[in-house]
Design a protein with these regions (language model features):
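Short acidic, glycine/serine/threonine-rich helix-capping segments at coil-helix boundaries
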Residues: 1-2, 10-54, 65-69, 87-100
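Amphipathic, well-packed alpha-helical segments that form the structural scaffold of globular domains
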Residues: 6-10, 133-136
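M14 metallocarboxypeptidase catalytic domain recognition
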Residues: 58-179
Length: 179
């Protein structure tokens, strides 16, 4: 999907001239620059290797292996995020005692949920995976399938008395059949 490509490229720092779903010269140029910077074949085609490299920008995080001298503060500065996001994504790690070789989740500085693209079932799943990595306390369950055969998910967070349900049935015009 061109909009998702444009979203990933813009989040990676490559100007696409707006997210409009049109694979024009600005998107092509941004794609080629991304490919060159990431050691990929500079063919202007968003093939499997390019999507693999771009995927972290759709997920909103990546994994980092702890090296000597790493601190959450240094990692936040290096990757343009903040310490609070790293702490939230890694509740099982002691920030004062990082172990060399351990892997930590590094959330990017941008919001996971985009508001400037049309959602698809695949983007919904990607966003959910990104939210789950950033906020590991979220409980995720599949509660069925839509009339179009795509999974329906429920996300649970918190344990208060008030319960609120948000759903993604609006994607692909499925709101028509949502009770």
């Amino acid at each position: 999907d061109v909009m998702q490509l444009q979203l990933a490229l813009s989040r990676a720092g490559y100007a696409v001239g707006g997210i409009d779903g049109i694979f024009g010269p600005k998107t092509l140029n941004a794609l080629r620059r991304f490919q060159a910077a990431n050691g990929l074949a500079i063919d202007g085609i968003a093939g499997m290797n390019t999507w693999t490299a771009l995927n972290k920008y759709l997920l909103g995080y990546f994994n980092h292996r702890i090296e000597r001298g790493d601190t959450y503060y240094k990692l936040a500065k290096r990757y343009g995020t903040d310490v609070k996001k790293i702490v939230s994504a890694n509740p099982d790690k002691n920030p004062d005692n990082l172990i060399i070789g351990d892997t930590v989740v590094i959330p990017f500085g941008f919001d996971v949920v985009p508001t400037n693209v049309m959602f698809t079932s695949l983007l919904t799943e990607t966003v959910i995976k990104g939210l789950k990595a950033r906020y590991p306390f979220i409980l995720l369950e599949m509660i069925g399938s839509s009339t179009m055969g795509t999974p329906l998910y429920a996300l649970r967070m918190g344990n208060g008395t008030k319960k609120v349900l948000y759903n993604a049935s609006h994607h692909a015009n499925e709101w028509i059949t949502t009770p």
